Each structure stands twice: as structure tokens, then as C-alpha cells.
Design a protein with these regions (language model features):
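Short N-terminal edge-element motif at the start of the domain
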Residues: 147-152, 158-169, 173
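Aromatic- and acid-rich polysaccharide-binding/catalytic face
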Residues: 123, 127-128, 227-230
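Active-site cleft segment of glycoside hydrolase catalytic domains centered on the general acid/base Glu
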Residues: 136-154
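Active-site-adjacent pocket scaffolds in enzyme catalytic domains
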Residues: 4, 12, 89-105, 170-286, ...
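Active-site and substrate-binding clefts of carbohydrate-active enzymes
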Residues: 313, 318-360
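Aromatic/hydrophobic pocket-lining residues that form the small-molecule binding cavity
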Residues: 52, 56, 111, 147, ...
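Active-site beta->alpha N-cap acidic-glycine motif
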Residues: 12-14, 18-124, 131-135, 164-197, ...
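Short glycine- and acidic-rich boundary segments immediately preceding or forming the N-terminal edge
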Residues: 1-17
């Protein structure tokens, strides 16, 4: 790679910039024969708005304290002022429509700051696309061309926030989003088939939109790494639960994000134990990467955020564990012998082989 000369170069209208290689990145290393694989854990965040709850800044701090890097799937309309919402032309919907709120001006500025600092901390900025449309007329019903339009707008709102907001005095984001963006997660995990067909043209390396699979080593779909939410053992029940805050919520208080406060402590333990069950199963077993998905939310008194913080503190500094971003995991997988990955994919989650002979 050419060495960086230390000059920050603005791109386009100055919304983004080339500020050199991202800090904190290490190249993927090939496993040696007989070597036990690292235990990768990927924490990811859908939306990534910094609002009055200050969860983006909180989890940047937690990550820093626990040697973790993560993936933030930015919803690009969080960089579009409400007054300019007509700039968004969603597939199958009227201009300016969205299933989520556009940001306040203060939240937009705070989100810009957090996104820039997250990148400098070594975290990945992925995409959660724009309007968060689900079900009828949502991503699951979009054509390949409609997904392309959604992707192009996701790029554009990040690359042109200065023009769209008029905030010319704020510093640029420290990365080129066209080069930075390596994958995303579709709202409601809908539409992966056509999304993948669209994503290929952008050189994306992974997709995290699968509606859920077992805790096994990842493979590729259409040449793109498939990083699904995973089924984890639910504490005290003979069922499994998808590895995301929303799915624990659905099992605990159903449709309500404000359930019975008397149950919060028990639900917090249940959620934390659910994530840790999934971790222990593979840490002591197949070493398949663990994927935990979240939103910045305060459901049921904030218990899901506390559960994730507790899990990060519990696992990220353990021996052999690497809490990484999805792109960092893709780097590592790309560095491996495909035959080795094929062998790893044969393992059940709790199956712990004799590594010295299994990967010789």
C-alpha cells in the first residue's frame, strides 16, 4: 500500500475526507497448522443515532475500556435535516417519507461527531440504509434496482451532509465512505436476496441481513460473506432466541417496550445469560464467531443495553477472544485457506475437536 503523506484531503463538498489509514487495524493472519482459532465476537448497532440518551458515546467508552472494536450500521437519513427530508426518494414511497424520524439538528450534529470519533477509535461504519421500511412496500419487496437506489442515497447523504445541512464550519468525517463501506444490515432483516445482487456492484464484502441461522462458521452467499443473527440457547427454556435485543424483548414483554418494571431485573439476567450461553457454547466448542446485534434504545428501563455492556466486560478480555468489527472478521476469513474454513463449517456449535489434529 502507498504510504500516507500526512495530508488530510477533503472529498467533494468537504463532508468527508481522506485522513490516511484507519487507526487500530491489523491485517488478517492465516491460522498455523493445528492452531486453535481465535474466538471472534462482533457487536453491531443498527441506526447509530446519538440522541439525548447518549448511547453511541456510552458504548464507544465501553468498547475502549474492554479492548473492543464494533460495527455501527449508520442510518444515512440521520445526517439529513428534517427540513430537507424531501431529498430522500425511497423506493415505493413518496419523497420525504420514512418509517423512522429524521433527526433534530442537535442530534444530527452529535451523530456526526460520534461517527467520526468511532472511525478514529477503529470501529467500522457500515450501513442500515435509509428509511427503515418493512413489510408491505419494504425492502423485502424491492427490486435489485430499487435496492441500488437506496444504496446510492445511503452513500450520498453521508458524502453530502455539508451541502444538505449548511453546517460548513463543522469538520469533515475522516473517511471516504465510498471506500469505507463494506457491508450493511437491512431493516427488519428483509430483502437479502435482491440486496445481495445490488451490493455486488459496490464491492461489498459481507452482509448481515440474514433472518437468522445457527451458531456455525460463516460461509459466502453470492460471493459475499454471510454474517447472520444467530440462534442462542434461551435461559431456562427449551427454545433458542436470535442474538438481538429486539428478540429478547419479544420473548419478555411482547409488543411493549415498557413492560412490568418488577420483572426488569430478571429479564436483564435472562438476556445477559442468553448471550453468555451462546458465547460459552462456541468458546468451549467450535470457536464459531458470535454475532450480537443491537439498537440504541431504552426498552424496559434500558436492560438490553446493560446486558450488552455486561457481556462486553465479561468476554472481550478473555484469553483467545477478539471483539472485532464485521469488516475485521471478513479480513481474517479472507486470509484463511478455504479448505480450513470448510472443515470449520462442519462443526456443531458445542463441538470441540482436538485442534492439533483437526486443523493440521
Amino acid at each position: 500500500m502507498p504510504s500516507w503523506d500526512g495530508q488530510v484531503r477533503p472529498i467533494g463538498d468537504g463532508s468527508t475526507s481522506d485522513s490516511g489509514p484507519q487507526p487500530g487495524q491489523v491485517p488478517g493472519e492465516k491460522l498455523a497448522p493445528g492452531q486453535k482459532p481465535p474466538q471472534f465476537v462482533v457487536f453491531s448497532w443498527d441506526g447509530a443515532l446519538e440522541n439525548d440518551d447518549h448511547l453511541f458515546s456510552r458504548f464507544r467508552r465501553v468498547a475502549r475500556e474492554n479492548n473492543a472494536q464494533m460495527t455501527f450500521f449508520l442510518t444515512s437519513i440521520y445526517l439529513v435535516p428534517n427540513a430537507k427530508r424531501q431529498l430522500y426518494h425511497p423506493p415505493q414511497h413518496a419523497p420525504g417519507e420514512a418509517a423512522i424520524s429524521f433527526p433534530t439538528d442537535d442530534h444530527l450534529k452529535e451523530t456526526l461527531h460520534e461517527v467520526g470519533e468511532a472511525w478514529r477509535d477503529g470501529h467500522e461504519i457500515g450501513t442500515h440504509f435509509n428509511g427503515h421500511f418493512c413489510e408491505a412496500k419494504g425492502g423485502g419487496e424491492w427490486s435489485v434496482d430499487e435496492w441500488r437506489s437506496e444504496i446510492e442515497q445511503a452513500y450520498s447523504f453521508v458524502a453530502n451532509w455539508k451541502t444538505n445541512t449548511g453546517y460548513k464550519d463543522l469538520p469533515p468525517l475522516p473517511f471516504d465512505f465510498r471506500k469505507e463501506l463494506a457491508g450493511g444490515r437491512a431493516p427488519c432483516l428483509e430483502g437479502q436476496k435482491n440486496l445481495l445482487a445490488a451490493a455486488k456492484g459496490y464491492g461489498w464484502r459481507y452482509d448481515a441481513s440474514s433472518p437468522g441461522e445457527f451458531q456455525v462458521w460463516p460461509g459466502r452467499k453470492d460471493g459475499i460473506w454471510n454474517f447472520p443473527l444467530q440462534l442462542l440457547p434461551y435461559p431456562g427454556r427449551p427454545v433458542q432466541v436470535l442474538s438481538m435485543d429486539f428478540n429478547f424483548l419479544a420473548n419478555q414483554s411482547g409488543d411493549s417496550t415498557e413492560g412490568d418494571p418488577r420483572k426488569y431485573a430478571g429479564w436483564l439476567k435472562e438476556t445477559r445469560d442468553g448471550y453468555l450461553n451462546g458465547f460459552e457454547r462456541v468458546y468451549n466448542g467450535s470457536r464459531a464467531p458470535l454475532f450480537i446485534g443491537n439498537h440504541f434504545e431504552t426498552w424496559n428501563g434500558g436492560i438490553y443495553m446493560q446486558a450488552v455492556e455486561d457481556v462486553m466486560k465479561s468476554v472481550c478480555r478473555r484469553d483467545g477472544v477478539r471483539c472485532v468489527s464485521f469488516r475485521q472478521l471478513a479480513d481474517w476469513l479472507d486470509a484463511q485457506d478455504p479448505k480450513v474454513l470448510e472443515r470449520l463449517r462442519q462443526l456443531d456449535p458445542a463441538q470441540s475437536p482436538d485442534w492439533a489434529s483437526f486443523l493440521k
